[in-house]
């Protein structure tokens, strides 16, 4: 899998396509994360997710990390089984995301043959299995990408031999997203996020 600064061989099974995430809610399948420091240490993410972030940076993909990983970033240490990437589905960005995926998957992206498939409204693509599944989304509840993009939270990830920028959904829009989703786990996250906003 290809965006490493220094190439190291990966076994295909380290990140494999999973079209059916059944069982991903079991405690054994979840990754417990602590709040990351900044810049984020290279060991915080799994090697494959770090590799994917390098690919996104290399191709200048417009994305923001959302979901449980974003909640963790804002200080709520809890379990999550994936990293959710919210991406712009405009033509240029869909094309460069397709290119990034093609490099990451060495030219053989599971189930995807053209960048236009990344533009299907409400598209959700899942690669891998918990606790390190990659989820790609072009829509999330309560938040439009173009409205949120200027307010994104930018931090740096240690990626030898240099730092690379990564993007998180900002706290205000993460709260809007959780309010719109309103699942039990979202409501639990919401209590913490609102408390964090008041104290912050």
For each of these PLM feature ranges, what is it?
Residues 2-200:
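Compositionally biased terminal segments of proteins
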């Amino acid at each position: 899998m290809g965006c490493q600064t220094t190439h190291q061989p990966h076994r295909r099974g380290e990140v494999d396509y999973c079209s059916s995430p059944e069982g991903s809610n079991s405690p054994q399948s979840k990754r417990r994360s602590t709040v990351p420091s900044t810049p984020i240490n290279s060991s915080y993410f799994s090697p494959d997710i770090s590799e994917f972030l390098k690919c996104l940076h290399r191709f200048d993909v417009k994305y923001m990390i959302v979901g449980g990983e974003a909640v963790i970033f804002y200080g709520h240490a809890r379990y999550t089984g994936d990293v959710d990437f919210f991406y712009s589905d405009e033509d240029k960005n869909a094309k460069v995301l397709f290119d990034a995926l093609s490099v990451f998957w060495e030219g053989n992206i599971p189930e995807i043959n053209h960048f236009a498939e990344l533009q299907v409204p409400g598209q959700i693509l899942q690669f891998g299995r918990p606790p390190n599944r990659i989820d790609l989304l072009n829509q999330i509840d309560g938040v439009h990408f173009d409205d949120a993009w200027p307010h994104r939270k930018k931090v740096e990830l240690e990626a030898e031999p240099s730092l690379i920028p990564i993007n998180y959904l900002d706290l205000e829009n993460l709260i809007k997203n959780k309010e719109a989703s309103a699942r039990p786990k979202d409501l639990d996250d919401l209590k913490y996020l609102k408390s964090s906003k008041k104290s912050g």
